[in-house]
Amino acid sequence: MARIGVENSLTDVQQALQQQGHEVVSLNSENDAHGCDCCVVTGQDSNMMGIADTSIKGSVIKAHGLTTDEICQQVENRT
């Protein structure tokens, strides 16, 4: 399964992705995003920790306005 970086405030998303078998990494700083296939951020600050500008190999999913299931589906589609 994929390695997914998730902001700390999105605990429900972290748990759901872990249940699906993904390796979940807490995003505390920009460096935590390196090596992730995909990152999930709140989207409330579009450049949280500089992740929007960093060159990770995966995509960045903004969780704002999405349900946990919708976020998990986007992760599946992008990894």
Swiss-Prot record:
Membrane-traversing stretches: none
Domain of life: Bacteria
InterPro entries reported in the protein's UniProt record: UPF0180
Pfam families associated with the record: UPF0180
HAMAP family: UPF0180
Protein family (similarity comment): Belongs to the UPF0180 family.
Official protein name in the record: UPF0180 protein BcerKBAB4_1316
Organism: Bacillus mycoides (strain KBAB4) (Bacillus weihenstephanensis)
